[in-house]
UniProtKB/Swiss-Prot annotation:
One of its GO terms (cellular component) is cytosol. Keywords: Aminoacyl-tRNA synthetase, ATP-binding, Cytoplasm, Ligase, Nucleotide-binding, Protein biosynthesis. Residues 1-37 are annotated as: Disordered. Its EC number is 6.1.1.9. This is Valine--tRNA ligase. Residues 19-35 have a biased composition (Acidic residues). It catalyses: tRNA(Val) + L-valine + ATP = L-valyl-tRNA(Val) + AMP + diphosphate. ValRS has two distinct active sites: one for aminoacylation and one for editing. The misactivated threonine is translocated from the active site to the editing site. It comes from Haloarcula marismortui (strain ATCC 43049 / DSM 3752 / JCM 8966 / VKM B-1809). A motif ('HIGH' region) lies at residues 72-82. The gene is valS.
Length: 901
């Protein structure tokens, strides 16, 4: 479990101290006596919420909000990306729960497939090849269970309001059934096929992978210029010593070379087309063919086609009906096609072949070269292209349909819809869903040993394992042969995790009605799919495909895409860079609520740097909230007063401003604009309520004006706690219980709504500016905040708030005026934007600076005339000084001028 001890202690001295005047406080014990100790309080509430089932889903509720949460792979410990992503999801869940929705907020573990196998091998220091399949699967289950238990504790310690009764595992029997049902349904629809064809292959994991599981990796290698003997040109036999040059980074593919290609616009090499060439070292003769896919700008412009080096090789092989020469096997070992290099790993064979080419005189040049290769995203091993038999889901014939399905969903942010569409537009392969691994969900198929016909499991049997379960028939339905061989492959993990909306909704086959049904149909389509932008092509696209094919509907109404967590230098975190920051280290130093404040610090979709300063800002907000709450608690009676028939102007104004904040923050939550909601709420609470209104309230209560102020303090305080609750669940729950002694959790109370208060907001805001200006005046002049001021003049609109300002700042005489005072404005300087001025005027910048220094310039409207040139308003800013010539000291706010006399 993540540790709950903090090296930072919350120092309460930087916010309002509770009043010492006992006449203004209740005689009962202080509900907030002492300091806030998150080290003790946060774990207590985490345990209490789970014990009380505070976040349980209510199937009988009238309104609901369903979230299709991403099941993390069980491949290690919690990282900052998890913390960030889970917290964003939790903001949504907590907000909707308080909006009177019952929230379906499940948690899943994607614990089948390659990630689980590699974790098991790493943890136990074993290889899956060294164990019988069943035994290795059991080891995977044991290791995954251990990590899942630890992971669950870690997620709970982040205050994520998961309903833990709705937890699923993708390897569990009920999920296996859903996955196998999906396979059978798509097969019956004609959307699946089995084919022996070129496949993207990971030699390290020894399995086929899909296009989506590849990623680019920069690699430093050698570009080798190799001489091929020309046997014939397109016009007849070639000269005895005629050669041409092929440039390649992969000479180990020479034994797999089956053709040479020239671009039809390559005039210099057109004479080769129709002829043939001999491959050095391996001596096979291959044809020279014209094809427009040749890149004339790379290397010599003449390209060898090998089976297979890349996607182009596959396309040429298919388009020109070329022979098949497989020189590399499933473990990246050279085959007998490679002759004397058989048994070597490809990297070893590459060096040996280069050396032999050099000795033979066929290696013309070998030079350094940086290029991009395709690697498996799980292990970063460079992929190969092998011919294997695999199961596929058809995608390419419905690309436009899947794009249109994406347009039926609301995207937050909108720009991520474009990324989804671009991925589909760039698809070149159908989805390979079979994997040659030990741990995974079995493909429910047997094959006839005679005719090869696939025999599908019956729906009632599922889940099945063909390796241990009997087939549904005794003989092949196609030819009658009585020998059936079980499928050994398992599903790609994404073939199962793409079904999470159906898993959570309880999708199943009903034999009585002979149709698919859902146990919780009210959940589907889900209201929200939250996830990172890095798995749009993995999880989101595949979920749309599967659910759309099974139900005819898109699986969710809204999609919320978050960015990645970067380090403080805005670089991606990685073990190789040594810049990974474990959440455990962060939570040893800071409260959980402070990390949640940090997580709300950027717009969704944007990559997000980890900055310790943001956590410190969150910690300061906790201090401010605790101290302000303690002050409110001591200023107000134990029993909440009824709303008076008439509120004082300043109280009505505060509640009207709070109404506007409630409406604005609510709208931002609805649009998933958490950073804007957080910043607006913090600003109003800190600057307006704490710094301005509380000072006024203290003074008004000391003057005996209690009822209106007490009601306003409590109304505002309760509202602030509820608005902060999704961001800061621990401290708001603690304050709610201590201050209001209510039985229910703050997180199940109703979200605040507008109280319908009406006030002159402009006048009130200006009055608060005046209070701030006078407080600043006292501080700058070394005066205590309760020092008396004899005479203050305010030039600005504060009608109705004069008494509040005078009382709060101890002003004996306060005069207000609508018109501005006599102020002289002079230009004190010109500030140039050199990023624009430099490129535009070059060597003339020096003369421009000198003329400005001498005051030799003229401002004409929005332009600056100086040194014989004209600068537009984007290139400069005018600096002004303002001087008050009357009696007293002037200070200005955004909306008023204040003079202390």
């Amino acid at each position: 479990m993540l540790p709950g001890c903090y090296t930072h202690r919350l120092n309460m001295s930087d916010t309002q101290d509770p009043p010492q005047d006992e006449s203004t406080t209740d005689e009962s014990a202080d509900a907030l006596d002492g300091e806030y100790d998150p080290r003790e309080i946060e774990p207590e509430w985490q345990d209490q919420w789970v014990a009380d089932k505070t976040y349980a889903y209510d199937e009988d509720a009238d309104t609901r909000f369903s979230i299709d949460t991403p099941p993390p792979t069980v491949s290690g410990n919690l990282h900052m990306g998890h913390l960030y992503q889970f917290t964003l999801q939790d903001f949504v869940a907590r907000f909707h729960r308080m909006r009177d929705d019952t929230v379906y907020f499940p948690f899943g573990y994607d614990d089948n497939g390659i990630a689980s196998e590699r974790l098991t091998e790493r943890e136990l220091d074993i290889r899956h090849q060294d164990y019988p399949r069943r035994e290795f699967q059991e080891k995977c289950r044991d290791v995954c269970t251990q990590f899942e238990d630890e992971f669950t504790q870690d997620v709970q310690s982040l205050a994520i309001s998961i309903d833990w009764d709705n937890t699923y595992k993708t390897i569990a029997p009920d999920v296996q059934r859903v996955s196998q049902l999906s396979f059978l349904d798509l097969y019956e629809q004609g959307r699946e096929y089995r084919q022996r064809a070129p496949t993207i292959w990971c030699p390290d994991c020894e399995t086929a992978i899909s296009q989506v599981e590849q990623e680019d990796k920069d690699k430093h290698t050698k570009f080798n210029d190799i001489a091929f003997d020309l046997v014939e040109t397109g016009e007849g036999p070639a000269d005895e010593d005629a050669t041409f040059t092929i440039s390649t980074t992969r000479p180990e593919l020479l034994p797999a070379c089956v053709a040479v290609f020239v671009h039809p616009d390559d005039d210099e090499n057109q004479h080769l087309v129709g002829g043939s060439a001999r491959v050095p070292l391996f001596e096979q003769e291959v044809p020279v063919i014209a094809d427009e896919r040749v890149d004339m700008e790379t290397g010599s412009g003449i390209v060898m086609c090998c089976t297979f080096g890349d996607q182009n090789d596959i396309e040429w092989y298919q388009a020109h009906d070329l022979p098949l020469r497989l020189a590399i096997d499933e473990s990246a070992t050279m085959t007998d096609v490679a002759g004397e290099y058989e048994g070597m790993h490809t990297t070893e064979a590459r060096e040996a072949i280069i050396e032999d080419l050099r000795e033979e005189g066929s290696l013309l040049e070998s030079r350094d070269h940086d290029h991009t290769v395709q690697v498996h995203e799980r292990c970063e091993e460079e992929v190969e292209y092998l011919v294997t038999e695999q199961w596929y889901i058809e995608l390419l014939d419905k690309k436009e349909e899947y794009i249109e399905a994406g347009r039926q969903m609301e995207w937050y942010p909108e720009k991520m819809a474009t990324r989804y569409e671009h991925w589909i537009e760039g698809l070149e392969w159908d989805w390979c869903i079979s994997r040659q691994r030990d741990s995974g969900i079995p493909i429910p198929v047997w094959y006839c040993d005679d005719c090869g016909e696939p025999v599908m499991a019956e729906r009632e049997q599922l889940p099945v394992d063909p390796l241990s379960d009997a087939p549904p028939v005794d003989s092949c339905p196609e030819c009658g042969h009585d020998s059936l061989t079980p499928e050994e492959d398992v599903f790609d993990t994404w073939a199962t995790s793409s079904l999470t909306p159906l898993v959570n909704a309880g999708w199943d086959w009903d034999a009585d009605s002979e149709s698919f049904t859902m146990e919780l149909p009210e959940l589907y389509p889900f209201d929200l799919r939250p996830q990172g932008h890095d798995i749009i092509s993995f999880w989101l696209f595949h979920t749309v495909v599967k659910c759309y094919e099974h139900t005819g509907e898109v699986p969710f109404e809204n999609v919320m895409i978050n960015g990645m967590v970067l380090d403080e230098n805005r670089e991606a975190m990685s073990k190789s860079k040594g810049n990974v920051i474990p959440p455990s280290e962060v939570l040893e130093e800071f409260p959980v609520d402070a990390t949640r404040y940090w997580a709300a610090g950027t717009s969704i979709g944007d990559d997000f740097p980890y900055k310790e300063g943001d956590l410190e800002a969150g910690e300061r907000l906790l201090q401010k909230l605790w101290n302000a709450s303690r002050l409110v608690d001591q200023l107000t009676p134990a029993a909440r007063p009824d709303e008076p028939e008439e509120l004082a102007a300043v109280d009505e104004w505060l509640l009207a401003e709070l109404d506007a904040t409630v409406e604005s923050v609510t709208a931002k939550f609805e649009d998933y604009e958490f950073s804007k909601a957080r910043n607006e709420l913090r600003s109003f609470f800190w600057n307006t309520f704490c710094d301005d209104y509380l000072e006024i309230a203290k003074q008004r209560l000391s003057d005996g004006e209690a009822v209106s102020t007490e009601f306003t303090l409590l109304q505002a305080h309760r509202t602030f706690l509820q608005l902060f609750a999704p961001f800061l669940p621990h401290i708001t729950e603690e304050l709610w219980e201590r201050c209001y002694e209510e039985d229910s959790s703050i997180h199940t109370t109703d979200w605040p709504t507008s109280g319908g208060y009406d006030a002159d907001l402009e006048a009130g805001e200006t009055a608060m500016e005046v209070v701030s200006a006078l407080r600043r005046y006292k501080t700058e002049n070394g005066l205590p905040l309760n020092a008396d001021l004899d005479h203050v003049e305010v030039f600005g609109h504060i009608a109705g708030f004069e008494d509040a300002v005078a009382e709060a700042m101890h002003v004996a005489q306060l005069d207000t005026y609508d018109e501005a005072p006599d102020i002289t404005t002079e230009i004190s300087g010109i500030d140039l934007d050199y990023s624009l001025v430099g490129p535009e005027f070059g060597s003339e910048v020096g003369a421009i600076d000198a003329a400005i220094e001498d005051g030799d310039y003229e401002i004409d409207g929005d332009t600056l005339q100086v040194a014989g040139v004209e600068l537009d308003d984007e290139m400069f800013a005018v600096e002004e000084s303002r001087t008050y010539s009357g009696e007293g000291e002037m200070t200005e706010t955004e909306s008023a001028v204040v003079v202390v006399r």
